[in-house]
UniProtKB/Swiss-Prot annotation:
It is an enzyme of class 2 (transferase). Conjugation of reduced glutathione to a wide number of exogenous and endogenous hydrophobic electrophiles. This is Glutathione S-transferase. It catalyses: RX + glutathione = an S-substituted glutathione + a halide anion + H(+). Pfam families: GST_C, GST_N. Its EC number is 2.5.1.18. Residues 87-201 form the GST C-terminal domain. Coiled coil: none annotated. GO terms for cellular component: cytoplasm. It comes from Brucella anthropi. Keywords: Cytoplasm, Transferase.
Length: 201
């Protein structure tokens, strides 16, 4: 598998899951402004929407959208928690959490819009806080991770997004469970491996 990524972007989530799954993978960086791959290729030829991530599973076959990519990687791994049985409540909960991560991701996206006025930024942050409050309510102090005691794909995705808030110096003190989740995720050796591969601390 080849993952097309941008350093620190949402593509870090599937990078983490590839690392955790122990599957062989290649990485190719993308210049999202120029829409060029690291080897100078036209990224629109890989993903017509021009966004990361994109996962090439074999020559000519590419999956886009994080939720789909994360589930695909899980289903092709040997990690039981990454691929609950079809039709099970556990699988539905995993997909529910991935869907919420997409909502949380969308809330944060506005933070990176160019020329954002103070009023617009305040509105974006209010929406982020609303979504983070929802996430906080979903998390349990009794569990090590979001869906229980096993690390799963939503943990990776949510942690990447929460990290954007940390990087933007947002006040996240109202979300201790979310911050603790991120802390646990960042402590995992395979997560640290993915960060190192992207040149992140």
């Amino acid at each position: 598998m080849k993952l097309y990524y941008k350093v620190g972007a949402c593509s870090l989530a599937p990078h983490i899951i590839l690392s955790e799954a122990g599957l062989p993978y290649e990485l190719e960086a993308v210049d999202l402004k120029a829409k060029k791959t690291a080897d100078g290729g036209d990224y629109f030829a890989v993903n017509p929407r021009g966004a990361v991530p994109a996962l090439e599973v074999k020559p000519g076959t590419v999956i886009t959208q994080n939720a789909a990519i994360l589930q695909y990687i899980g289903d092709h791994s040997d990690v039981a928690a990454f691929k609950p049985a079809y039709g099970s409540i556990e699988r539905a909960r995993l997909q529910e959490a991935l869907g919420f991560c997409s909502d949380l991701h969308a809330a944060f996206s506005g933070l990176f819009a160019p020329n954002l006025s103070e009023e617009a930024r305040a509105g974006v942050i209010a929406n982020i806080n609303r979504r983070l409050g929802q996430l906080e309510a979903m998390l349990s102090d009794k569990n090590a991770y979001w869906l229980g005691d096993d690390f799963t794909q939503p943990d990776a995705y949510a942690s990447v997004i929460i990290g954007w808030g940390v990087g933007q110096k947002l006040d996240l003190s109202a979300y201790p469970k979310a911050l603790k989740l991120r802390e646990r995720v960042l402590a995992r050796p395979n997560v640290q491996k993915a960060f190192k591969e992207e040149g992140l601390n």
